């Protein structure tokens, strides 16, 4: 009987993987000045990057129009701010799908509809309770219009985990595990969707460059390995460790067969003076190795998910100079904001050797001086600065403790000083996790 059950599991597993094939796409963000037009961007995605799928952060009709009659698989997104509206109204959800998705479905290969972006990282905790109800409503709306091929999901960062090391001890944060994540996993499992994950080995490596090998983080061939004491599984790169930590967290909540999709990954091609290893050479190396590994047939999977097909999107198409935060946030692009390549990468995985000569790394050691994330000179939008200050302070109670009246770093009537302090504190903590 056990043999029969095993055969059934293997057959089902094969059928599941047959529905998807190893594909690496690219995230197409729009937070930059003078970016190429949507039509030119799509041309670059297809010819320069050779990507098979693309993910955008809204449902911009100008961009969706550029995807008409292409072979690109497309992922679109519902913005965080309208999640409560969808959660509370099926008619609102139906209307949104009818006017943002339905007009393009005959000519654009929309395959994923994502509800929000990193909602469970947001300091707006009231939003969390609206997430899963919104996902359910959106799925009903898609079914209403017979759009059965579109999977519903939501991207999560690595900070949804309470524990990620060793991988076998992966677990979700206690404030979200039972009330939000478990119902979400149940929905994703029943609808045969994915756990969408934003995962960046750069950030944990940059926090511990003396303890984590750079080659291990870049997926280079190396003798460095790590053996999980709980499972005996051997790891040869940091990304596999991070993916399996999420897999075990999902498994421990009762969903061992739920598939993972990498919604974002990448390596910064530049950054601030204290952001070690953020350079073109490392970015090219990581993304090239990633593309080769995640387009391989048969699929490699991970130590805990051998042979698993893991669809993925690299971040990002362009450098985006309007993104807030540390310098790395604006420098994940494979292309410059004008469309010129920062380096060559073939996301189809077909190119094994590259002709371009990569520049030598200049920031291979940790910066010894002091560095701050500050409000840029010349910024006059005080409302935007207040919003940034409020956002940073709301993320954790302790971030802005020292700039309260009577504390060491308080300066009366100095909004810019307080905002700079808060942003520095916020980003120094956020970059300690890999997503």
Where are these regions (language model features)?
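Terminal membrane/secretory targeting segments in land-plant proteins
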Residues: 1-26, 362-368
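Active-site mouth loops of central-metabolism enzymes
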Residues: 21-36, 86-87, 170-175, 372-382
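Hydrophobic faces of well-ordered beta-strands that scaffold small-molecule active sites
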Residues: 24-28, 52-56, 74-78, 111-115, ...
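Short, acidic/polar
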Residues: 29-45, 90-103, 178-182, 384-388
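Acidic-and-aromatic substrate-binding clefts and catalytic sites of carbohydrate-active enzymes
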Residues: 32-36, 53-65, 82-93, 121-122, ...
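Catalytic domains of carbohydrate-active enzymes, especially glycoside hydrolases
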Residues: 40-62, 73
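Substrate-binding cleft of extracellular glycoside hydrolase catalytic domains
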Residues: 64-176, 262
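Substrate-binding and catalytic surfaces of secreted/luminal carbohydrate-active proteins
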Residues: 136-140, 148-153, 161, 176-430
